[in-house]
Amino acid sequence: MLENLVESLRNAPVVKKGDYDYFVHGISDGIPALNPCVLKEISEVLAERIDLDKVDKIVGVEAMGIHIATALSLETGLPLLVIRKREYGLEGEHEILKHTGYATSKLYINDLNEGDNIVLVDDVVSTGGTLSVVINELKAIGVNILDTFVVVEKGEGKKIVEDKTGENIVTLVKLDVVDGKVVADSLI
């Protein structure tokens, strides 16, 4: 069902960032060029799993959750919202400090309110740093997270997020880097 995605991940180059094995893929990095068949395959699989009548917005996390959320928004006809890396100073803006395996930065949530029903999407869960703080802040705001979808699960990131947030995370592909090569298998 996710043959194009899995095959493209298995062919992804791997680079070392300190002690961190980082795979480079169009879904997670925007390079190499992402075959639109892969993005379409992802959006179709995700759209099949959403109860469209209950969702107010598709929410993606900048940067690499944007194209996934956009494709899903186009596939479902649901409005798109992006959790940004830039502060706007709008009324009701929420700032989040996030720590990942390779960086510390801030994210900003706007235009989400108590009672909003959302589907949250992102590209990769690896250390759980981004997704954990985003989910916990959304819950603190009172947003109802109906589903959380992540395209790639690397290492123990999914379990870390589930333990820290109490939310169920649905991942499409389980990936690891073994001896400098990507090993990937579909979970759907």
Curated annotation (Swiss-Prot):
InterPro entries: HGPRTase-like, PRibTrfase_dom, PRTase-like, Pur/Pyrimidine_PRTase. It is found in: Cytoplasm. Its main location: cytoplasm. Its EC number is 2.4.2.8. PANTHER family: HYPOXANTHINE/GUANINE PHOSPHORIBOSYLTRANSFERASE, XANTHINE PHOSPHORIBOSYLTRANSFERASE. Homodimer. This is Hypoxanthine/guanine phosphoribosyltransferase. It comes from Methanobrevibacter ruminantium (strain ATCC 35063 / DSM 1093 / JCM 13430 / OCM 146 / M1) (Methanobacterium ruminantium).
